[in-house]
Amino acid sequence: MREIVHLQTGQCGNQIGAAFWQNISGEHGLDSNGVYNGTSELQLERMSVYFNEASGNKYVPRAVLVDLEPGTMDAVRAGPFGQLFRPDNFVFGQSGAGNNWAKGHYTEGAELVDQVLDVVRREAEGCDCLQGFQITHSLGGGTGAGMGTLLISKIREEFPDRMMATFSVVPSPKVSDTVVEPYNATLSVHQLVENSDETFCIDNEALYDICMRTLKLSNPSYGDLNHLVSAVMSGVTTCLRFPGQLNSDLRKLAVNMVPFPRLHFFMVGFAPLTSRGAHSFRAVSVPELTQQMFDPKNMMAASDFRNGRYLTCSAIFRGKVAMKDVEDQMRNVQNKNSSYFVEWIPNNVQTALCSIPPRGLKMSSTFVGNATAIQELFKRVGEQFTAMFRRKAFLHWYTGEGMDEMEFTEAESNMNDLVSEYQQYQDAGVDEEEEEYEEEAPLEEEV
C-alpha cells in the first residue's frame, strides 16, 4: 500500500526525524517499542505506509538513520523511542563532517553512501508498491547538507520514477550555527533544484518566532522547535496514513503544487498552534483554522508571502470537518485576497480532508504553499554567499577536499536563476504572451 521510505541525515535531520516518529507512533497507537495498543481500526488500516509489521504485533519504522559521527545516533537510541528502530538501519561513520559540505558530499560521505544505499534498497524491496522517499536534513551543515544531497542524487539514479520529498531546514538570518552556512546551503540548493520533487522549507528563526509569539515560550529548546516541525510533517503525510474523503499523496501534492519543475520549494504552516503539554482551552472552528493557517506569522520559513504571490497552495484539514465549510472558507480566502494569488492559474488552492485529527485536538489543518516570496530566503543566503565568496573566505576547507571553485560559481548562478524565475512568475500577468506576438508580427513584414 503506497509505502514511503524515510531517511534522516546529520544531527538536525536525526533530531527532527526522531520527533516525527515519536509523533506518528502516537497517532497510530504504538508504544515506544512499536507494539500496537491503539483503540481504532483506522490506526491499523494504512499502518504499512510508514511501518513494517514484524513478529509479535510489533511495528518497525521504514526509517534509515544516517550520520557521519555516532553522537546523535546514540542520543536517538537512548531517547524515549530508541527501541522503535531496526538496529541495522543505523548507519554511521566515526569522523564527522565538521560542517563541511565537501566532506559530506565527496569524501567522508561518499565512503559511507554505499552502505546507506544497501539499507535503502532493502527497505524498498520490503515494500509492496513504493511511493517515494522523504528525507529530513538541514542545509547549513556538512552531513545533512552534503551527504543528504548525495543520497538524494544516488536514490534518484536508482529509483528515477519515485517521488522525492525533502524537509529541509534552511539557515536562518539570526540563528546561525556556523560561519560557512551560506556555502553549504547554496551548494545544497543547487542539488535540490535538480533532484528533489518537493522541498518543504523550514527555518529555525521562524520556528523561534512562533514559539515566542504564539506559544509564549520564553526560552524555546530545540525540542520545542522539532515538535512544530513534526506536526507539519505529520500533517503533510496524514492523507497517506489514514483514510479520508479527499485523499492526496506525495505525487498528487506535487502535481497540484509544482507549476514549473524547478519551482518546488514550499512554505509550510500548521494550525491550531498549541504549546507542548498545554492543549487549547477553546473550541477551534474551520474559519479560525483557515485564518490562522494563512497568517504570515504562522509560516515556518522566514519569508513573508505578502511580498509576493502564491502560485499554488494546498490545505490539509484533519478531524470532523464538514466538506462544505472547508470549501466555503477556501473560496472566501481566494476571493478576499485575490491579489495574492496569480491569476493565470485558476483554482490554485487544493484541499484534502482526513477524518482523524492529531492526538489531543478536535481538528487541525496543515498548510503547504508555493509562494514566490520564498525567493527572499534564497536571496538572503545568496547575499551572504557572495559576501564570503568574493573574498574566497574559508574556501580552502572545500578545495582541500577536492572541490573546484567552479562548482561554487555554478551553484551561485543556479540559485540566482531560481530567484529570478520566481520573480518572473510573480510579475507575470494573464495576457502578456499575446502582446509579445503582436509586437513581433510587424517585424517580419518589414524584412
UniProtKB/Swiss-Prot annotation:
GO cellular component: cytoplasm; microtubule
Localization per Swiss-Prot or TrEMBL: Cytoplasm, Cytoskeleton
Cited InterPro entries: Beta-tubulin_BS (IPR013838), Beta_tubulin (IPR002453), Tub_FtsZ_C (IPR008280), Tubulin (IPR000217), Tubulin/FtsZ-like_C (IPR037103), Tubulin/FtsZ_2-layer-sand-dom (IPR018316), Tubulin/FtsZ_GTPase_sf (IPR036525), Tubulin_C (IPR023123)
Keyword Disulfide bond: no
GO MF term list: GTP binding; GTPase activity; metal ion binding; structural constituent of cytoskeleton
One GO-annotated biological process of the protein: microtubule-based process
Sequence positions that bind GTP: 11, 69, 138, 142-144, 204, 226
Alphabetical keyword list: Antibiotic resistance, Cytoplasm, Cytoskeleton, GTP-binding, Magnesium, Metal-binding, Microtubule, Nucleotide-binding
Pfam families documented for this protein: Tubulin, Tubulin_C
Ranges where the record places region Disordered: 426-447
Necessary cofactors: Mg(2+)
Purpose: Tubulin is the major constituent of microtubules, a cylinder consisting of laterally associated linear protofilaments composed of alpha- and beta-tubulin heterodimers. Microtubules grow by the addition of GTP-tubulin dimers to the microtubule end, where a stabilizing cap forms. Below the cap, tubulin dimers are in GDP-bound state, owing to GTPase activity of alpha-tubulin.
Oligomeric form and interacting partners: Dimer of alpha and beta chains. A typical microtubule is a hollow water-filled tube with an outer diameter of 25 nm and an inner diameter of 15 nM. Alpha-beta heterodimers associate head-to-tail to form protofilaments running lengthwise along the microtubule wall with the beta-tubulin subunit facing the microtubule plus end conferring a structural polarity. Microtubules usually have 13 protofilaments but different protofilament numbers can be found in some organisms and specialized cells.
Protein name from the UniProt record: Tubulin beta-2 chain
UniProt source species: Colletotrichum gloeosporioides
